[in-house]
Amino acid sequence: MRLDLIVSERLGVSRTRAQNVIKTGGVSLRGEILDKPSLDIDPDPDLAITDTLRYASLGGVKMEHALDFFHLDIRDKVCLDVGAANGGFTDCLVKKAAKEVDALDLNIAFPAHLLSDKRVIIHDKTNVKSVGDLFSKDKFDLITVDLSFISLIGLIPLFYPLIKKEGALLLLFKPQFEVGRKFLPKSGIVRDKKAIDKALASVIAAAENVGFKMIGHCPVPDIFPDKNKERTILFIKQ
């Protein structure tokens, strides 16, 4: 039986979360760490499983790192989580004492504790391009963005009117969706540093062109070394 299926059943969590628990060292057998979700193994009673994830998904670890790096205090802040998905960002925001988090995505799969949290307002089956119709101007203290299969450049202007003056925009920069097909290898892992730097500069320029001021950017925690090197970028609305 696959290891991720065993972990999923024993913890009562999704298969994706089970895989992340395995990859982050949460499973061992008689002292040996098992870190391959696809490992075919018998359900051994000596299999030690610990849910190592502090948040609903690994996105929460990325968000926590960014908040700490930029010294962002979100206590009593009103936030919008764009690309909420499994709830990692949202989970981190509410645990850091946000007043309210509007969570938006095409397919939200939150754990029960987020679904029942009164601070969380869910906008499921909702396209990011509709944010201007959904929310009033100057509503949010912070907008966080974690999207895939789309460039950030065309979306940034949508967020500007929704953020209060001196409010923040925190983007997760994913090079595989920003460098263009020419620089995207079949593996999907972008290693061309010049292409990555150029794409990063383009995203920053797009934000500055609509009135944001860049505060800085930082790498996300290197949880999986074989994946694309993501960065978080912080902007302030002037």
Regions found by a protein language model. Give the residues of each.
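Conserved beta-strand signature within the Rossmann-like core of class I S-adenosyl-L-methionine
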Residues: 166-179
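A short glycine-rich, Lys/Arg-flanked "PGG" loop and its adjoining helix->strand segment in the class I
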Residues: 153-168
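A basic, amphipathic helix-loop patch mediating RNA/tRNA/ribosome contacts
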Residues: 1-43
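S-adenosyl-L-methionine
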Residues: 104-152
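Core SAM-dependent methyltransferase catalytic element
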Residues: 222-238
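Conserved class I S-adenosyl-L-methionine
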Residues: 75-85
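Conserved SAM-binding loop of SAM-dependent methyltransferases across substrates and taxa
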Residues: 86-97
